Structure formats: structure tokens, C-alpha cells
């Protein structure tokens, strides 16, 4: 180290001053004080808060900025030669065990009281901060090349981050000290296990090698060329190179690689500096620059190994076979990995990084204009990039006003490979890729050119932003479907077969070699690629507002489930697993065994290994994978999505479950962000042919079913921005959602041939998330469509006037559903009596538990029940008594109605059980105790008029609030009216009613919301800073 750079401890006061000039702007005011006191390098490394206070740095924030930069110098000065992944793991392991010992020692003391819920002591929080600091040092290594490209280390990094975030959440939870300590002990034991795993891999040279410094000189730099480096700066002042431009000075020297850390520029230490000051230092000498780089260990002892020599690697087909390190075989059983060669294909695909563009940054003249050649390119219509105007780039801030480039509006260029490219042409030297702009800030982990862009995809992308769910299951229609729907389904089935002919292979192209992607493109497109390279440009911000036309084509209609298990090939992980089925019947089997195949971040399941079609699949990057502790079945895990649904799986043994979780996390680590951008396939698809029964209430241990079967008119199928009908290719933007008209609704009701029966089936299915996110009516309450569509489909629209149809559930369709079903009985009671003059009675407007029971009672006279006549639970609280009074007031406005209800019971045991459940009776005929949800629904059932319901609801709120305030006033009057009040009595009263006293103080004093902050928020923000950075190109 002494031969390369002078140790920081040997710095003179002038060198300390020179280093401080590159720190944050707010610290420049203190340079004179440091210069006056002649602070040397050794004093700088040992400086404390008190010494900074003596130097005039009084603000805590400024002190922290200086100390953070000094910590980086300490790590450079003392830990460079000894710091490696193994020692960092030892430090984290020691911190975790120290925290465990601290908790154990506290419990052994005689003054320990674990039942209290007071805040944790400062020494406890200090140990937590030390633990997270040790974790950050380890993450700084795992988050960079070459460790970031190895799946085993990537999974370890994600686990450490998750545990640290969990630790920060635990210390700020409101629970007893004993419970908090137990949770922290569990996290510490898990962290120790992770560290032991890393330490056990001591045979891997990546674990035991230390970082080293290397001096690189770049000369003969043209003024218009630049250095050709992409530099990422973390929040605390570490500058990491993320890539180089091809044929640039940085690329030609063959010594600068992704993951290198810039330590010095022209022998001036820049650790802790601002990015703009680093850029100015690089531009200081136009003829050349001398860089001192800190290089991470590679797979060999040299600083430029073959596999990681440069980030523009050759395609995998041209690379020599290199023996894998033992780390990958530890976490991945060989029996579950596809092994066409001796190396792990999935790991090499994660390591593969395609060539970056040659000129992502075009220097402009002093006026900010592009060169003349580029202007000529614009004149002839060539796709010319705008340079490296990354939203994170400091260098481009002065030009942002001219081009208005923000993160959403960044123009991306995608290109297709030339036809008939041979293997020799795939090399970087012979095929320079000029004119391509890397996405935003060039993340080195992902393939930025490898995705096939279909021309029709541009039209489909506008839908993708607003419709999360693309549901494409080819489920069978229930036998209650009408004949014209069956006939239409046959025609649709023939078309779907033609569309699915070409979907016999997975359609994930990210992180694939260029030659393989070329072959896949030619196989799928079936048309010759033009001789010249094709360019497609699109803007991300315009995806939400562009095409609204219906898209057609073979790619748009294909389903990923139409691939046999044999054609899918050997997956990255496969085996038998249990899958939890949606509870469609009370007595149905909840779990079923399937053959699962994990392939390219997608999970397929088949009935057996020879099945010709997958029963379902999930695109895993869109789902969160975790243990399913809420299920009673052993070794269960789940794939959940907050907007779609959750899938539950279970393995036979604990090892199998861990193997599946590890493999899924490994494969989805590199896919997550990319799949979120390019997701043109479906998130999931599943066959429902074995479950055509009506749904029933699931057991207590199972989560709520993902959808219900309440029928609704077709116009409601796109009401939610998150749900789209099956096989529907119509746009789901806000504009198209609001364009439904009364004529279209009448046309759908009368059975127009243009309406797809599959869409009608999908319109009868609503997810629980859809129910939650259903827009409110003008009165603020949810009113759900509950009547079967069959009545409306076969009713004579001419015989019943639109005034007799039921009112709406959603604001955008209120007039349509009101015309279809008739008005409320409160406003149109006489007309309803004329309409039902044959002895029939108005419909019930309460929400049924199951629409399948309506099918059974389809031919029975439909009656309207008074909402007050439902079986009500006993009122045991004053709040329920208020509801009863309000319900009686509502009954006076509604008027007299018939109390009889005539329903024809179904023949099946299930329908009988559902009828008993609706009547709040047990199977033995005894009254069943109502649940909290039924208590809540009982109030909504009081009145069918939403306006009246809103008034009653508001009255109930006001009464409850008034009663609570009266009680508080009585408590306050008890103190104020006491003429003999003493200080002791007042202190006792204040302790007894502490919450009330704090409310009074809070209302009398104005609080600044910015002043309310938690101590642990600092810990969370410091951990989050590990991943916050800005990036530029020089």
C-alpha cells in the first residue's frame, strides 16, 4: 500500500485541507478552522465529537457528515490489507453474538422486568446499531461485482438485508421488552447462521482474498471523447465504476472493470467526496488522468481474470468452459438443475452481461449543441440518441431544461440482431454497437438489449400499466350456462387452439446469450429478419396514454400453459408438491398433489410428468415468496401478490421446502426489476375444470378465497383498474372504462353475437381485492350487484320499462343498472306493486352469501324481505342499541312490506347447508352465534336507500362521539369542580387519565410534525442509504 499511496495517518495538515475541499458544500466553512489548528492525518482518523465541537463544528448533522467520511478513511487506512468477505462475516457474527449475550445478561440481572413496554435502553440500541453497521460493511462487498453476479451470494445478500430490516422493525414495535428480545434473539441466531455459511466456504478464493489497490493511467484523451466510465456514488461518498463505454480510453486500457472503487484521482484521495467534485477532478487535466482503484477479489489472484475481465463478455457459446467454484454446488442440488454441459446454465445466465453501447454520452460544444453529424442523422430520420442524460447524472443537469429528460420519459432503443449472424460475428471486436443508449443508469446486473420487442407490443403496453391481472385460463363453463354461450365457446376454443400453436416454449428472453436470442426470435416470428439492424423507439411515459384499439395477433393470444411437460424440458428445480385449491365446496379436498417445474422465473404445475398441458403457472417476479405460517399443513409456503391472489404450496419434508424456496429466490433475484418493466406475459394462469362447484366458506386456517361468484352485468367487468376479463384484449384505460353507454348495455343484455361468452363468464367472477377497491357510490357505501344475469338475459326488454330496473352499484354504471333492475322500493313502491301484480314480490336487495343458491331458486317466486326481519344478533352494547333505534326510524320511512319469504330449497346437501347458514342456524337447527362481520352487515341491511344509510351512519358517528366527549367532560369537571384540590390529588388524577391529559396538552400546543421522529428511523435510513446512489458518466 505504501508504494501506491501514502497512508492517511501520514498526511500533513495541507493534505487534510485538500481532502476536506471535496466534501459536502456545507462543510467548507470549517476548513479554515482545520487549517488554523493544523489537524494532521493521524489526528483526523482519531477525531471525536468533542474535538469537532472545539473546532467550531457545532451542528450534529455536520459532525456526522465529517465522521462518516473519516470512517471511510479509517477503513481504507487500517482495513485494506485484512478486510475480506471472511473477516467481515466474522465481524457480523461477533456483533450478533454480542447482542445475544447482552440480552442474556440483562435477563440474569435481578432488576430485569420483561413485562414492561417501555422503550429499550440506549446501550441496547447501541448494540443494534453496531450490528447493522457490521451488516452494512458485509453488504458493501456482496452488493458489487463479482459477488453480485453469483446467485449464492446474491441470495445471501438479500437474506442479510431482510434480517436487518426486520431488526429495525422489531425495535420500534409496541410490545413488551421480553417479546422484543425474543424476536431480536431469533434474528441474531439467523444472522449467525448466514455468517457461518459464508465462513464455511473458505475454500472459495473469493471469500478469503482481500481487496488491493492498483494505479491506472489514462492518456491521449480527446476533448470530445471523454474517459468513457460510468461512476455510481453512494450517499456517504464511495465512488464505484459500473461500466465503461466501448472503444473509450477506459475500455482500451483493459484494466478498469465493473465494481472497481475510485480511491484517488491524480494522487488526490477522493473518498467521501461529492460526485460533482470527483467529476471536476477527472476533468482537471485534459491530456490524461491517473486513477488509483480499489479492486475486489476475482476468481483468480490476478486483477483481470478471464471470466470477469470486462463486463462486455462474449456470448456463452464462445466462452471456454471454466470450472465452477464450490459455492454454487452447495446451495443447489445437482439433481434439480438442468445440466446440458458441465457448468450451471442458470448461474452463467445470471453472470452474462451483453455489450453496452459504444457512445452513450455525446459531448456537446460550449453552447450545448449536438455535433453536425448527429444533426444530419436527425435530418434523414436516423434514430440518434440524446446522450447520457440519465436522471441520476450530475453532468446532464445543465441540459435537462433543453430536453426535459426525466426517469419516465427516457427514450430506449431496442434492436434486433442481423439475419444469419455467425458465431464469429458475435464477438465484441467485430460488431461494434454504436448509437445505443443504455437504460437510464445502466444497471450492470441486467440484460438491456436481450428482450424481443414485437411491433404489436407497443400497442399492448398502454394496457399493461392499468390492468395488473391478465387472466387467461381456459376454464370450462358450468352446466348452468345457456345454449348460446356454449355455441360461442366452441368457436372461441378453435381460435385459441390456433393462437397457442406457437407457444411451445417459455417466452423469457432476459439474460440469454445473443445467439440463443437470435434463434428464438427467428423461431417465433417465422419471418426473415431484415439485413439491416432494425430499431424500435418508445417512451415509457407514453405507455399509459397511447393505443386504445383492440390488438390482434398470435403473440397476443397465446397462453403459457399450452406447453407440455416434455417440451418444457428439465427445469431449474422440479418435483412433487401439494397445492392448495380454492375452497369451492365446504366438503371438498383442500390440497392436491401436482408435478411442479421451475423454469426461467416461472413456476408450472402438471397433473403428472407426461401431461400435455400445464394446469397453471405463475410469473414469480411479480409475487412474494415466503413461508405460509397461517396454514395448518406442514412445510407450506406461499406466493402472494397484493393486487392479484395468493397461491399456497406444501412440500413433503423440510429439506424439500427449503430447496424450493432457495431456488425460487435465486432465479427471481435477477428477474424482478426487469420483469416488472417488460411484463407482457400473464402474471398467472390456472385451470378451473376440476372445481365447477359453487364456493363455500373455507375453514378457519385457510385464507379468504381469491374471488367470489356474485354475478354482475358485463359492463362491470372492467370497473376495477386491477381486473381485466379473460381473453379480453380491449383497452382498460380510464377513458375506455368510462365509455360504456346504455345502448351497449342493452345490446349485451339481449344476447348480441359480438359479445364473447368467455367475457360473460369472467364478468361473474370478482376478486376480494376488487370488492375492496370497488368505487363508492355518491353516498359513500358499497352496493354490490347480486342478482343472476340469467334473469336479465332472457327477460323481454320491451315488456319492462327502464324505470322498473334496479339501481346501480358503481357511479359510472349507476344509470345502466338502475334501468336494468328498477328503482329502490322507497321511491317506487307503487310501481313495483304494479310490476309484480301477479302475486310476485319485489326482489331482495340484501347481499346473498352464495349465488349458486340463486340458481337453485331460479324458478321460485322472488320475494323482498324487510332488512329488519333478518335474524339479528342480541344487542349487548350501547352501540347496538343505537343501531336498533336508527333501524326503527328507517323502517318508518320504508313503509310496510311483506314478511313472508318463499324459497325453493335445493336438493344437494351443500345448498341445504348454505340455507341454514344464511338463516344463522346450525345444522341441528339451533341459533348460531353471529360473527363480527355479520354484526357489521346487520347495520347495512337496515335500509336499502343509500342516502338514508349515509344519514343514519353519520348520526351513529355523531352520537358515539358525543357520548365519548360527555364522558371526558365529566372527568375534567370532576377535577375543576373540586375546591379543595391538592397537588397530590391532581397528580393521581393525571396518572389515572394520562391519555386524556396528553390529548388536552396536544390540542392546546401546536405540534410540528417534523419534530416527531423515532430513534430507530435513523437506523432504517442509514440501512436504506446503502442502496441509494447517483450515477454519472465521464
From Swiss-Prot:
Record's keyword terms, sorted: Coiled coil, Cytoplasm, Disease variant, Intellectual disability, Membrane, Phosphoprotein
Pfam family, one: CRIC_ras_sig
GO MF term list: identical protein binding; protein kinase binding
PDZ domain residues: 215-297
One Gene Ontology cellular component annotation held by this UniProt entry: neuronal cell body
Composition bias, Basic residues: 545-559
Cell compartment(s), UniProt: Cytoplasm; Membrane
Modified residues (Phosphotyrosine): 683
Coiled-coil segments: 875-904
Domain PH positions: 570-669
Biased composition (Low complexity): 324-340, 730-740
UniProt superkingdom: Eukaryota
Membrane topology: Peripheral membrane protein
Effect of residue 46 to H: In a colorectal cancer sample; somatic mutation
Biological role: May function as an adapter protein or regulator of Ras signaling pathways.
Family: Belongs to the CNKSR family.
Identification of the protein by name: Connector enhancer of kinase suppressor of ras 2
Lineage: Eukaryota, Metazoa, Chordata, Craniata, Vertebrata
Gene: CNKSR2
Amino acid at each position: 500500500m505504501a508504494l501506491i499511496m501514502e497512508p492517511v495517518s501520514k498526511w500533513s495538515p495541507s493534505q487534510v485541507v485538500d481532502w476536506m475541499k471535496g466534501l459536502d458544500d456545507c462543510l467548507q466553512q470549517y476548513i479554515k478552522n482545520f487549517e488554523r489548528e493544523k489537524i494532521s492525518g493521524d489526528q483526523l482518523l482519531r477525531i471525536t465529537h468533542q474535538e469537532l465541537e472545539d473546532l467550531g463544528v457545532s451542528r450534529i448533522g455536520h459532525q456526522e457528515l465529517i465522521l462518516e467520511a473519516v470512517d471511510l478513511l479509517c477503513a481504507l487506512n487500517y482495513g485494506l490489507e485484512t478486510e475480506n468477505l471472511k473477516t467481515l462475516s466474522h465481524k457480523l457474527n461477533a456483533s450478533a453474538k454480542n447482542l445475544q449475550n447482552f440480552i442474556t445478561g440483562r435477563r440474569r440481572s435481578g432488576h430485569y422486568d420483561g413485562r414492561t413496554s417501555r422503550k429499550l435502553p440506549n446501550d441496547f440500541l447501541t448494540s443494534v446499531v453496531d450490528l447493522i453497521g457490521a451488516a452494512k460493511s458485509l453488504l458493501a462487498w456482496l452488493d458489487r461485482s463479482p459477488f453480485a453476479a453469483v446467485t449464492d451470494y446474491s441470495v445471501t445478500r438479500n437474506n442479510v438485508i431482510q434480517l436487518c430490516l426486520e431488526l429495525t422493525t422489531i425495535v420500534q414495535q409496541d410490545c413488551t421488552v421480553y417479546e422484543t428480545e425474543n424476536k431480536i434473539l431469533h434474528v441474531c441466531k439467523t444472522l449467525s447462521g448466514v455468517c457461518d455459511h459464508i465462513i464455511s466456504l473458505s475454500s472459495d478464493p473469493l471469500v478469503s482474498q482481500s481487496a488491493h489497490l492498483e494505479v491506472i493511467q489514462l492518456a491521449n484523451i480527446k476533448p470530445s471523447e471523454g474517459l468513457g466510465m460510468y461512476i455510481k456514488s453512494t450517499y456517504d461518498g464511495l465512488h464505484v465504476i459500473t461500466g465503461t463505454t466501448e472503444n473509450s480510453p477506459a475500455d482500451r486500457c483493459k484494466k478498469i472493470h465493473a465494481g472497481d472503487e475510485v480511491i484517488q484521482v491524480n494522487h488526490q484521495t477522493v473518498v467521501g467526496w461529492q460526485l460533482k467534485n470527483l467529476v471536476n477532478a477527472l476533468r482537471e487535466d485534459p491530456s490524461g488522468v491517473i486513477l488509483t482503484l480499489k479492486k475486489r477479489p476475482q476468481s483468480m489472484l490476478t486483477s483481470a481474470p478471464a471470466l470477469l475481465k470486462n463486463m462486455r463478455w462474449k456470448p456463452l457459446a464462445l466462452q471456454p468452459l471454466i470450472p465452477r467454484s464450490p459455492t454454487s454446488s452447495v446451495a443447489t442440488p445437482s439433481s434439480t438443475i438442468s445440466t446440458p454441459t458441465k457448468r450451471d446454465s442458470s448461474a452463467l445466465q445470471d453472470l452474462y452481461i451483453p455489450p453496452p453501447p459504444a457512445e452513450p454520452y455525446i459531448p456537446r460544444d460550449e453552447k450545448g449543441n449536438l455535433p453536425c453529424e448527429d444533426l444530419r442523422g436527425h435530418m434523414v430520420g436516423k434514430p440518434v440518441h440524446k446522450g447520457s442524460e440519465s436522471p441520476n447524472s450530475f453532468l446532464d443537469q445543465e441540459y435537462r431544461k433543453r430536453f426535459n429528460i426525466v426517469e419516465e420519459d427516457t427514450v430506449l432503443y431496442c434492436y434486433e440482431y442481423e439475419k444469419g449472424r455467425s458465431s464469429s460475428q458475435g464477438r465484441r471486436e467485430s460488431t461494434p454497437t454504436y448509437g445505443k443508449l443504455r437504460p437510464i443508469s445502466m444497471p450492470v446486473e441486467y440484460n438491456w438489449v436481450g428482450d424481443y420487442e414485437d411491433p404489436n407490443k407497443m400497442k399492448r403496453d398502454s394496457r399493461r400499466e392499468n390492468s395488473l391481472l391478465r387472466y387467461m385460463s381456459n376454464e370450462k363453463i358450468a352446466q348452468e350456462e345457456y345454449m348460446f354461450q356454449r355455441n360461442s365457446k366452441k368457436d372461441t376454443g378453435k381460435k385459441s387452439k390456433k393462437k397457442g400453436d406457437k407457444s411451445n416454449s417459455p417466452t423469457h428472453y432476459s439474460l440469454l446469450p445473443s445467439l440463443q436470442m437470435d434463434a428464438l426470435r427467428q423461431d417465433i416470428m417465422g419471418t426473415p429478419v431484415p439485413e439491416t439492424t432494425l430499431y424500435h423507439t418508445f417512451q415509457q411515459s407514453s405507455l399509459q396514454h397511447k393505443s386504445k384499439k383492440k390488438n390482434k395477433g398470435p403473440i397476443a393470444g397465446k397462453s403459457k400453459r399450452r406447453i407440455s411437460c416434455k417440451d418444457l424440458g428439465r427445469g431449474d428445480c422440479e418435483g412433487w408438491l401439494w397445492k392448495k385449491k380454492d375452497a369451492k365446496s365446504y366438503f371438498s379436498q383442500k390440497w392436491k398433489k401436482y408435478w411442479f417445474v421451475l423454469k426461467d422465473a416461472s413456476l408450472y404445475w402438471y397433473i403428472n410428468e407426461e401431461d400435455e398441458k400445464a394446469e397453471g403457472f405463475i410469473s414469480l417476479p411479480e409475487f412474494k415468496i415466503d413461508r405460509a405460517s397461517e396454514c395448518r399443513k406442514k412445510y407450506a409456503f406461499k406466493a402472494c401478490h397484493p393486487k392479484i391472489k395468493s397461491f399456497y404450496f406444501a412440500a413433503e419434508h423440510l429439506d424439500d421446502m427449503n430447496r424450493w424456496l432457495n431456488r425460487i429466490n435465486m432465479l427471481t433475484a435477477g428477474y424482478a426489476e426487469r420483469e416488472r418493466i417488460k411484463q407482457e406475459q400473464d402474471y398467472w394462469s390456472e385451470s378451473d375444470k376440476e372445481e365447477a362447484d359453487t364456493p363455500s366458506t373455507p375453514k378457519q386456517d385457510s385464507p379468504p378465497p381469491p374471488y367470489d361468484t356474485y354475478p354482475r352485468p358485463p359492463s362491470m367487468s372492467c370497473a376495477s383498474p386491477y381486473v381485466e376479463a379473460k381473453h379480453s384484449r380491449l383497452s382498460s384505460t380510464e377513458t375506455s372504462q368510462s365509455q360504456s353507454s346504455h345502448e351497449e348495455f342493452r345490446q349485451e343484455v339481449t344476447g348480441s353475437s359480438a359479445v364473447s361468452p368467455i367475457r360473460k363468464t369472467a364478468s361473474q367472477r370478482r376478486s376480494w381485492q376488487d370488492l375492496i377497491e370497488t368505487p363508492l357510490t355518491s353516498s359513500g357505501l358499497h352496493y354490490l350487484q347480486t342478482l343472476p344475469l340469467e334473469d336479465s338475459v332472457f327477460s323481454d326488454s320491451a315488456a319492462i320499462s327502464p324505470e322498473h330496473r334496479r339501481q346501480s352499484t358503481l357511479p359510472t354504471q349507476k344509470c345502466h343498472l338502475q334501468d336494468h333492475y328498477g328503482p329502490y322500493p322507497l321511491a317506487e313502491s307503487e310501481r313495483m306493486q304494479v310490476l309484480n301484480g301477479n302475486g310476485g314480490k319485489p326482489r331482495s336487495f340484501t347481499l346473498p352469501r352464495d349465488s349458486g343458491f340463486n340458481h337453485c331458486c331460479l324458478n321460485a317466486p322472488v320475494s323482498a324481505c324487510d332488512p329488519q326481519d333478518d335474524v339479528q344478533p342480541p344487542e349487548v352494547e350501547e352501540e347496538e342499541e343505537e343501531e336498533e333505534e336508527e333501524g326503527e326510524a328507517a323502517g318508518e320511512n320504508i313503509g310496510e312490506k311483506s314478511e313472508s319469504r318463499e324459497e325453493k330449497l335445493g336438493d344437494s346437501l351443500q345448498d341445504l347447508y348454505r340455507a341454514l347458514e344464511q338463516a344463522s342456524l346450525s345444522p341441528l337447527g339451533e341459533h348460531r352465534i353471529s360473527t363480527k362481520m355479520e354484526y357489521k352487515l346487520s347495520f347495512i341491511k337496515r335500509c336499502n336507500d343509500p342516502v338514508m344509510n349515509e344519514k343514519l351512519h353519520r348520526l351513529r358517528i355523531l352520537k358515539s362521539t358525543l357520548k365519548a366527549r360527555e364522558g371526558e367532560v365529566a372527568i375534567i369537571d370532576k377535577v375543576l369542580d373540586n375546591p379543595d384540590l391538592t397537588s397530590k390529588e391532581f397528580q393521581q388524577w393525571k396518572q389515572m387519565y394520562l391519555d386524556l391529559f396528553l390529548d388536552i396538552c396536544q390540542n392546546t400546543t401546536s405540534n410540528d410534525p417534523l419534530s416527531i421522529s423515532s430513534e430507530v428511523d435513523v437506523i432504517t435510513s442509514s440501512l436504506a442509504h446503502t442502496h441509494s446512489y447517483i450515477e454519472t458518466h465521464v
